[in-house]
Design a protein with these regions (language model features):
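N-terminal accessory segment detector
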Residues: 1-160, 165, 171-188, 196-216
């Protein structure tokens, strides 16, 4: 092989994109952007397959309650260090900006909509993490109803990290859920982020086996 070809094989697609932008080659830059998007989501899918296999194997061998512990540990080690700002004293507008960013800039997902009413913000999204798994013909799901699966059977093992971390653990830490996840058909999900945590309806506490503390 030619040395030049070997050298070119070492260059990341991001560096190729930077060079195309610097040269003003918009056609190549757009093609590379599409390739990055395609490869990112395809490779993410391989990780989802892996995670689902691991969670299913653990549930089968150790029982479903072991998944609750795994999701809690993952919450402390991975999720709260990155998303703990949601429980800080920042404006609800800043919270929704940051929450949207996690979808658009971390997942690389374009949201269906962000809506606002007097009480809350609503995010509508075709979820390409847990929502993607729920589109598979087979995947790990709860055989029994647990507080950490919103009191329901047939909840995706992967998706259960949402009620465990952002509802149960958030209530333990701050007294209220970070946001509320509501899986929908066709891999979609609706998230509610209440502007004033005191206005989160009690039903959302009950569905994860928690009690809402009333102001004295």
């Amino acid at each position: 092989m030619e040395k030049q070809e070997l050298k070119e094989l070492t260059v990341s697609i991001f560096e190729k994109l930077r060079q195309a932008i610097k040269k003003g080659d918009s056609a190549k830059a757009l093609a590379l952007t599409d390739e990055i998007d395609r490869n990112k989501h395809d490779f993410d899918e391989s990780y989802r397959i892996w995670i689902d296999l691991l969670l299913t194997y653990i549930a089968d061998k150790l029982g479903e309650e072991a998944l609750y512990e795994i999701h809690r540990i993952n919450g402390e080690r991975a999720l709260w260090p990155r998303l703990g700002w949601i429980l800080e004293s920042i404006s609800p507008e800043e919270k929704i900006r940051r929450r949207a960013y996690t979808w658009t800039h971390w997942h690389g997902t374009t949201l269906d909509a962000i809506e606002e009413d007097e009480e809350k913000f609503t995010i509508r999204v075709k979820c390409d993490s847990g929502g993607s798994i729920r589109m598979w013909p087979q995947y790990g799901k709860t055989k029994e109803a647990h507080p950490w699966s919103w009191g329901q059977k047939d909840v995706c093992y992967y998706c259960a990290h949402c009620p465990v971390v952002f509802e149960i653990m958030a209530i333990e830490k701050a007294g209220y859920p970070a946001w509320l996840c509501n899986p929908q058909p066709e891999g979609r999900c609706i998230h509610y982020l209440y502007k004033n945590p005191a206005n989160v309806p009690e039903k959302y506490y009950k569905r994860v086996g928690m009690k809402k503390k009333t102001a004295k």
